[in-house]
Amino acid sequence: MSRVLIAGCGDLGCRLGVSLSEKGHEVFGIRRDASQITPPIHPIEADLFSQLPELPENLDYIFYIVSAPSYNDVSYYKAYVMGLKHLIDALKDQSPKRLFFISSSSVFAQSEGEKVTEDSPAEGKNFSSRRLLEGEELALNAPFPGTVIRFGGIYGPGRTYLIDMVLQGKAHCMEDVYSNRIHSEDCVGLLEHLMEKPDLDTLYIGVDDEPTLTCDVYEWLAEQLSVSNIEHREPTENSRAQRSNKRLSNAKVKATGYQFKYPSYREGYSELLESL
């Protein structure tokens, strides 16, 4: 069994840590408020934005799963660059088998509905993308092997924004705009799967099988919830929705043997709706 460190042990990190612990791995989690770390993860109370305390020895795998506390350049720099620098420095006397850096598919600049793979160019067109790409470069140039996973939009328990908007009658969708998503359980499953693979590439896209027109998702949810009047809008050129208009391919990660529990939004949201 392996010794695993999860830096940034929030919702996704705790889900991963608990799952790994249940499989017999020894898992440590870093969080500013260690009381929020779910047992049986071993808590480490520390701030990644400051110098870190001495870390557990003989770590095999590192997961960097940090979220910026707010949407501005300083927050993104601290979360994806400064924090990672501090972590790599704290690991200077160790030789983990791999560092996994959790990034975002938002670094892909394509916005005309194109098919996007790991070979497609990524561009730092805004501060968030620039900082994420800077963090990716740091991870891949660390003194131990690194792999970047660019997740699409994550949904699942506790991440029910679309459902809430539809139920409240506040939902509107952008016409002819594709969106890409992944259930949080598949995020965990995918990371566990990759951790067990000895030979990995440096970059994987983490999304389900089905890039989907945003309005199709909203309309399907509205039908399941017996809600009408989903407002359709034309996307503006610089809107966030328009910037996300691409069709991400998961062919590379599926080629590693991973099988999605929720291959599309229908399976994932159906289960969420049943739990309401």
Residues covered by each model-derived region:
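NAD(P)H-binding glycine-rich loop region in Rossmannoid oxidoreductase-like domains
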Residues: 41-90
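Catalytic helix-loop patch of NAD(P)-dependent Rossmann-fold dehydrogenases
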Residues: 112-148
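Substrate-positioning beta->alpha
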Residues: 161-164, 173-195
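Glycine/proline-rich active-site loop of Rossmann-fold NAD(P)-dependent oxidoreductases
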Residues: 133, 142, 154-168, 193-204
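Conserved Rossmann-fold NAD(P)-dependent oxidoreductase catalytic core, especially the SDR/UDP-sugar
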Residues: 86-125
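C-terminal amphipathic/interface module of NAD(P)-dependent oxidoreductases
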Residues: 241-276
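Mid/C-terminal beta-alpha module of Rossmann-like enzyme folds, strongest
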Residues: 190-193, 197-238
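N-terminal Rossmann-fold NAD(P) dinucleotide-binding loop
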Residues: 13-14
